[in-house]
Amino acid sequence: MKTYLVTLRFHWGYSIRNYFASKVTDTYIVPPLNTVIGALAMANCARNGIHIENVLGASNAKNFASHIKYAAFMLKYRPIKFTSLLRYSTSIYWLTAYDVQRGTKLSELFNAMQFGFNSYLNGIMNMLLVTDLEKADLYSITRLGSKESIVSVLDVKEITGKNITKVNKGSIIKNVTFSFNKDLVESVIGNFFIETIPSYNEAFYNFFMQPMNIATEPIYVPNPIVSLITSKDACLFSTDVGNAIGPSDLW
């Protein structure tokens, strides 16, 4: 596995919601690992001429789960989250919905209300990624979230050598700018916000049977920088844009 710093630029913002009822769920500011795996699977498949998102009984994203071990994120500023946004047809002709049994017109809107939208105009997101995929796959990322969440990859740098170290429980780490799991820290000093996101779940890639129990995990997101004390042994990554911590087995 190698560690990369991937710099992404969003064109206008992004929406990262829960499949399958994605239009009526809130958006996440920090992408869950399942979203990252899906984005990289799509990038790799497109680069290799495989343009199939879903095949009955199989998922391309599921095959990439073992290739991504860890991901952490740094935001230039906190995106503005909107809880609802009306979706409407932009075609020439309005589509009208009818109740067939009653024979009555329901609405002239063809789509559901969309909940969850992060306004992040031309915003930069740095992604620290531990993976065995090629650098070309990382440069091929075009979206991170829903189909509207278009990104451009500005740069991909490999982090090596002395920039990756193991730190012991009780260590004081300064200049932390990347998101981290609450379980890794004993205390945090600085400005941050907490995002509760779904833990990795292979069942999300089964498009015909949804998971009944979804575990979540609290993620601390520095806004813009914090210092912390580790609650257990951890792995420290030093980058040009600040420090990141992760589980000790990454070292």
What are these regions (language model features)?
Residues 22-29, 57-60, 87-94:
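Structural preference for beta-rich elements and adjacent junctions enriched in aromatics
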